[in-house]
Regions:
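Outer-membrane beta-barrel transmembrane domain signature of Gram-negative proteins
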Residues: 1-12, 96-110, 178-281, 286-290
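Flexible loop and strand-edge segments within Gram-negative outer membrane beta-barrel domains
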Residues: 2-25, 29-32, 42-123, 136-140, ...
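Transmembrane beta-barrel architecture of outer-membrane proteins
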Residues: 4-8, 46-52, 140-146, 218-222, ...
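Residues on the lipid-exposed face of transmembrane beta-strands in outer-membrane beta-barrel proteins
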Residues: 7-15, 53-57, 145-151, 223-227, ...
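Short loop/turn motifs that connect adjacent beta-strands in outer-membrane beta-barrel proteins
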Residues: 16-17, 32, 62, 152-162, ...
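Outer-membrane beta-barrel architecture
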Residues: 19, 64, 140-144, 157-163, ...
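Transmembrane beta-barrel strands of outer-membrane/channel proteins
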Residues: 24-26, 67-73, 164-170, 238-244, ...
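Outer-membrane beta-barrel proteins
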Residues: 31-35, 76-80, 171-177, 187-188, ...
Length: 315
């Protein structure tokens, strides 16, 4: 059993032309692992602080500016295993309760059983393998920001609008990890009926290891014309959009950025929300392909019929 707490604060308000929203939260969760009689404190736990701020401004009656920023800072400490939380729980689940007494008077005791390796033969895991092995602490910081400008263009034709949007995201993760070894004991039955413990190995001090930090950064922008209009029972819409993005430090070939650009078109029609048709086309490209093969055209179309809107279907 572990204790966890969560606290959130939200503030919102504004005027007829300006609206804002601010949120902050803190989350803390204790660790499931408890260490006994070790010369260091591992402090297995997870802490997170997150924040968000949204601001919408009606610049004019037809122009809206939106700015959003969000992020979180979290720190996690877990046993030094190279595994995720799921892997550790699975190993504890697979370990046999009859294989060893475990901790006795602060000693890690390995008793002889039918399975002297402390685990079922087909699982390869043991919950006691995490005792005294060290720790891994991860500190992660992420930031997300975007800004968008919307402009109604009804003065040109009713239902026409334009928007431009840009976003930026970044992340940085640092690691602190240290390994250690712990002595184990095997019980030996003495002639007088008492039990003595034979010691193997020594409790060692933590040995800190270097691990490179991880980082990520990307940006995205788009500009689009939108059109939506009703003519009696006829509904039509159209979209023309340009977008561009770039990702730095991707997981594969982290020193090579990955960029994409595209133009998208879409047209839709429906009659009484009963018969529908849609056509899409995209012209997209990536700088990661060879020159002359970076762009492609991708069309798509569809038709729909909502039969439940027919008169013969209704009671």
């Amino acid at each position: 059993m572990t204790l966890q707490t969560q606290h959130n604060v939200n503030i919102s308000g504004g005027t007829d032309r300006v609206r804002y929203f601010i949120s902050a939260g803190a989350y803390t969760q204790g660790g499931l692992f408890k260490e006994f009689d070790l010369p260091y404190n591992l402090s297995y736990q997870y802490n997170r602080f997150n924040y968000r701020s949204n601001l919408d401004i009606d610049v004019t009656k037809t122009t809206t500016l939106s700015m959003n920023i969000a992020g979180n800072v979290n720190n996690a400490s877990k046993p030094y295993t190279g595994q995720g939380s799921a892997g550790m729980l699975i190993n504890m689940y697979y370990s046999t309760p009859f294989s060893s007494p475990g901790l006795v008077d602060g000693k890690l005791v390995n008793a002889s059983t039918d399975y002297p390796d402390l685990r079922m033969p087909f699982t390869g895991g043991s919950g006691m393998g995490y005792y005294g092995g060290g720790f891994m602490r991860t500190s992660n910081n992420t930031l997300n920001a975007d800004v968008q400008l919307k402009q109604k263009l009804d003065f040109i034709t009713k239902g026409l609008s334009f928007h431009i949007k840009g976003s930026y995201n970044s992340g940085f993760t640092s690691y602190t990890q240290a390994s250690a070894s712990v002595a184990t004991y095997t019980p030996v039955l003495q002639e007088d009926g008492t039990i003595a413990y034979k010691k193997y190995g020594q409790n060692s001090q933590l040995k800190y290891e270097d691990k490179d930090p991880a980082k990520s950064r990307d940006w995205y922008m788009e500009a689009a014309l939108n059109y939506a209009r009703e003519f009696g029972n006829h509904h039509v819409s159209a979209l023309l959009l340009y977008n561009q993005s770039k990702i730095y430090y991707p997981s594969a070939y982290s020193d090579i950025p990955r960029g994409m650009v595209g133009i998208v078109g879409r047209a839709t029609y429906d009659w009484k929300n009963r018969y529908m048709a849609e056509f899409n086309i995209g012209y997209n490209g990536s700088e990661n392909y060879a020159p002359g093969k970076r762009f492609g055209t991708f069309p798509a179309g569809s038709f729909g019929w909502i039969v439940s809107e027919e008169k013969f279907w209704k009671p």
